[in-house]
């Protein structure tokens, strides 16, 4: 599913929104192969044994798109780039470690600071005692704005990186910039010239990757380079010093990522996350627009030589033993799980950790292959030398709730039974279950239990897994299952309306199966728990910071006839019109017996959620002393939210929907925006007290970062807004510092 889907839901639920289509689904990471799963129990490979074929009735769609294994028609190539050849993986030289592996203390050299993706900085100039003195040091305008009438697909989500003398970032539509980290002056800009039609769910670029070549001599162009994946499916390399394309990379500095994907249309597939480089291999994933058709473009994961841009390998779920690039009229297998979340590289183990989502058509699983059932909604560790899975850990079995993993894995060490550190991985999920795994083999370090779940389900031929995994060794980032007495409203009439909705729906807890006879309540919901902001971790104190959502959904499968009556159709249907079942709201799920209707569980008249507040929380967990909750409180005030879409201006901390993550520093400060009240906060890491806040010019739905320039600490947040969160749009990167250090 998509990254921010639930945000909008929550925003309306909490704070009054005009009626809004609330499902912005995207499918996350492709997972595949036949590795063993580290979680016991059904669903990890014992799924249904159906093998899709071109002649399967349910697989036929009213639009004659490609079958899952059929030859491809010419694929969409938004960049008009020629295809390039492949390289034998054995010919790839061992690369020098990237700068992100051990950045200078004042740098922020990767999306999550460094290769561990802890979102921790060793800087300590800003403390809980002086944070209230923070002032705006400078504002940088990206110049990237939606055109009139196009704010419904806009969310920058950008986190800059800082290496040496430059702050590097991308705009919502993928222009790449280098700016002076002390003054905000633009040093260079590389324009991508991306078309609006290429935007899928939303215009977003979470960040770029810094890579140092071991083959280009220091001082020569493209010794240091910036890598970016684009919405129109290009992998681009530019010189970090000048912004010029690296001519020796791909085709004149660009690689066509549509190669091998088969039939598609602009906006169906896209890249929004910075690709990790692991031992000289740049690994790319992509999102596939949710809710379209069963045989959507593949969710394949691919590796390319970071020096030359040549293809190395592919992990294609339904071709587990074939890592080659399709040639001629062939293509990667269609409809497989894709990955839209940021991946994490591990140079020491030679692995990349891929968070995966569902196969295409999130809410119906009868057409999924056994290989797909093994690796959907999972963490898959791929060997970057071969592209083969080393291990798989599944967080939901046979997922039909859109509980794809939107978070990036965080790497840290946990004490082992012999006292020696164990290389660990923290994987937050939308369910609010946080799994802590041994990243060498994927086995749980903290206890995980398989618990009974509602089974077999009510949809013919689509049984549910009888058990689901629960991370009992970590505090759950969720509230208990809903009850009718939890229904809430601004008046007794509102509450009664919500109680009636509750009674009319199927609801037996978290894994209530989808139904076609009446709605079912999905809770925590596809925007519940942790999403793409992930978590931050302080390795010195052992404190983990997590922000999360409480946003139920009200869903219902509809027959194919009803879906047609509703005008639901996939984006690649010749008759498709915007609003006819795109990324948000209802989905056609063409090629299956059903469409899907997805709405927030709310009072559509006031725009308020039916469950009582809070709708967003922030939690600190002590990972060194029994995984205890140190503090927890609502995140976000009512100042910009209210019934009927009217801001109340009230400073009450009601806990709003939030998206975007946090940063924690050696100074003991947590920085976070994320909430729909359009503020950035500094929080005392040890007490949870908010010690400073500032109103942003737009929604802060991005991960902040902090860095040092000229001996002083700065904090940066992209206040670009988010259409799903219904927050104001701006093009401003806002940078703060203590008063003596303004640019």
Curated annotation (Swiss-Prot):
UniProt record similarity statement: Belongs to the bacterial PQQ dehydrogenase family.
Reactions catalysed: glycerol + A = dihydroxyacetone + AH2
Major subcellular site: secreted
Range of residues in the leader sequence: 1-24
Keyword Secreted: yes
Enzyme Commission code(s) on record: 1.1.99.22
Location within or outside the cell: Secreted
SUPFAM superfamilies: Quinoprotein alcohol dehydrogenase-like
Biased composition (Low complexity): 27-41
Cofactor(s) needed: pyrroloquinoline quinone
One Gene Ontology molecular-function label: glycerol dehydrogenase (acceptor) activity
Coiled coil: none
Keywords in alphabetical order: Oxidoreductase, Secreted, Signal
Role of this protein: Catalyzes the oxidation of glycerol to glycerone. Also acts, more slowly, on a number of other polyols including D-sorbitol, D-arabinitol, D-mannitol, meso-erythritol, adonitol and propylene glycol.
Name of encoding gene: sldA
Protein name in the entry: Glycerol dehydrogenase large subunit
GO CC annotation terms, alphabetical: extracellular region; membrane
